[in-house]
Amino acid sequence: MAEKFEAFVSLGLANGRYKDFYDIYVLADRYNLDGMELKNAILETFSHRETGFDDIAAFEDEFTEDVTRQRRWRAFIKKKKALLKVEFEDTIQLLKVLLIPIVDAIYKDESFEKSWNKETKNWM
């Protein structure tokens, strides 16, 4: 998950790797996650690849509202015959709920001793 997150951050607005977004969505939908474990993995991956958290283009409105990107997302979902037929905006929204609190904890150099609950789709 950390590598997929780093990939879509480093690619910025040029990102066309819809599988990364989808895979993270599926993991958040299907599994409970340990916050500290995920935070440490993200921190290690971003540090190793020298990627910053300053600009996460995928979390900007212009990224999710782009009509071409939405069309490509629907084509990806159709071609993949995805089990979870989710809209692009809903996918990005879940990724924000999942990942922004971890990024905030990294910025503040704080621990993140929470658990992701797959049922509520939130940190507890």
Regions found by a protein language model. Name each.
Residues 1-124:
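Structured mid-to-C-terminal alpha-helical surface segments
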